[in-house]
Design a protein with these regions (language model features):
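N-terminal strand-loop element at the rim of the active site
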Residues: 7-11, 23-68
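Aromatic "clamp/platform" in nucleotide-sugar-dependent glycosyltransferases that forms part
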Residues: 260, 279
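Conserved donor-binding/catalytic core segment of Leloir-type glycosyltransferases
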Residues: 193-219
Length: 373
């Protein structure tokens, strides 16, 4: 199948999933064309049958905000016409599904099919803004196929966008179990922490919804009882606020800001605990990646996280903002080697339910169904 993929190429869940899916599809013999404004973040090496098409957005004084969605529509049209795309997989409803529909209209209705994957904030945040709600709803409903990364996100879409539930196929995110495992890389502990220190990790785009400050507050309480170091991976608008809080709490010397990292698997494989204190998560891909590396996860009980993290089995769940509870759960594991080993093994075992070998064929099957209609 010739597949176009339109996505945000940046550091974030939807872009990561789109890129990893494209790589897996290419491995399985499909021809994949990424259509976006920059090379996808995790597409850092040559992969046979993968092509990248840059969306160019000319700057004109007339436009205070250059219309990327229009340039994307034309780029999709050009790639579809030149390479004979069978389908366009839009990751994130706006503007990708919108631009795909425009491209399809320009080519005439009998061309590629559109499959839109809903990832989270396109439904729970951006799409519910009055400025974008109508176009988000239109774009989803005009798609030939719709997938959501969790049952939670499917329910939200049905409730807020009047989409028939039978039109939405839930296909969860997946993880490469060969790359994400505890023994996949040489141990970097000595480069990241002092001997005897436990390594606690958080990875995000440092936006307010991720509540990175809660991760620092949890760590501050844990570090009073257990020698430990907090690794903060990623970057974003909240970083300076997080740095100031670490200084205010007196833990800045034990908090390492690593910025954006292309290969988080190496960091997760030597971590002892992963913190995900988000206010909202449609799935929690990074929690799954941590679990695959045998790292117990302490997360908030929101959105699709309970579909991945089972409280008391492969991690712990707590209410949003309950930093004391999260700290207590962290200490329970970090002070009891047997409890940690049991939860680490359970985390890896449960992550296997979300292997690429299990999930990617679900997309292939859905592609076939959609093309056959």
């Amino acid at each position: 199948v010739k597949i176009g993929i339109s996505c945000y190429p940046v550091y974030g869940g939807s872009g990561v999933v789109a890129t990893e899916l494209g790589i897996e599809l290419a491995k399985r013999g499909h021809e994949v064309h990424f259509i976006t404004y920059a090379p996808p973040f995790r597409l850092s090496h040559f992969v046979e049958r993968i092509f990248y098409h840059e969306v160019e957005v000319p700057q004109y004084a007339l436009f205070e905000h250059p219309p990327y969605n229009l340039a994307l529509s034309v780029a999709i049209q050009n790639v579809a016409a030149t390479h004979g795309l069978d389908l366009l997989h839009a990751h994130y409803a706006v503007p990708h599904a919108t631009s795909a529909w425009l491209a399809k209209e320009m080519l005439g209705n009998r061309c590629f099919r559109i499959i839109t994957t809903l990832h989270g904030t396109d439904i729970t945040l951006v799409g519910q803004d009055p400025s974008y709600h109508a176009i988000t709803q239109f774009s989803i409903r005009r798609s030939d196929g719709i997938t959501a990364v969790s049952e939670y996100l499917k329910r939200e879409t049905v409730q807020h966008f009047a989409v028939e539930p039978e039109r939405i196929r839930v296909i969860p995110n997946f993880v490469d179990l060969e790359r994400y495992r505890r023994d996949a890389y040489p141990c970097h502990r000595s480069k990241l922490a002092e001997p005897g220190e436990k390594i606690i990790t958080h990875i995000s785009n440092f936006r307010a919804v991720k509540r990175v400050t809660d991760a620092v507050r949890v760590f501050a309480m844990v570090s009073e009882r257990v020698r430990s170091r907090l690794l903060l991976v990623g970057d974003g608008p909240e970083r300076s606020h997080v740095q100031h809080l670490a200084e205010e709490l007196g833990v800045s010397d034990r908090v390492t800001f690593l910025g954006k990292q292309a290969s988080v698997a190496e960091l997760l494989s030597c971590s002892d605990l992963f913190l995900l204190p988000s206010e909202q998560e449609a799935f929690g891909l990074v929690a799954l990646e941590a679990m695959a590396c045998g790292v117990p996860v302490i997360a908030t009980c929101v959105g699709g996280i309970p579909e991945v993290v089972t409280d008391g089995i492969n991690g712990f769940l707590a209410p949003v903002g309950a930093v004391e509870t999260m700290a207590e759960r962290a200490l329970t594991l970090l002070q009891d080697d047997d409890a940690w080993e049991a939860m680490s093994a359970a985390a890896r075992r449960d992550a296997e339910r979300f292997s690429a070998d299990r999930i990617v064929p679900m997309y292939e099957s859905y592609y076939e169904e959609t093309l056959a209609r």
